[in-house]
Amino acid sequence: MLAFVGRTESLARLTAAYQAVSSPPGGAVSGWAGLVLVTGEAGIGKTTLLTRFASRVRADGGTVVWGTCWDGDQAPAWWPWTQALRATLDQRPNLAETVRPELAAIVPELATNSPVIDSDTAVRVRVFDAAGQTLGQAAASAPLVVILDDLHSADQSSVDLLRFVAHEPQPGAL
């Protein structure tokens, strides 16, 4: 295991933010969501910090899903969300049925027909709504932490979805 040096305060802040939305009083209340941005220079240990934090969340009974952004023009649209939603649905497969058609645009294995992926506003709205529903329903049974690593490399659709999820009331602690 890598040495974990000099990040105790950062880990404490992440833990406090998690507890603020997941633990009573004030937390674990319908509609609570939190957003924490971890910044720093390349190689400073952000991913190591988040890995340590994820271990704490899991030990506390929470769920953690990851998505990693690609650096470069070859990245598929929505890629970090495809990974995070795929992991969420793997852990809670019962959620897939209610959002299958909408999420098929970004989680291809959910498609029953060949989906058409475009930037049409209606498609984006359906994807945003379905992603929010999926994450909110997953968070209703246990606190859910979504980690989007290397967010500086995210495509605009992924950033827009993050904004939506962070501002939309959720039925659980997200």
Residue ranges and their predicted role:
Residues 1-174:
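Key residue(s) within conserved catalytic/signature motifs
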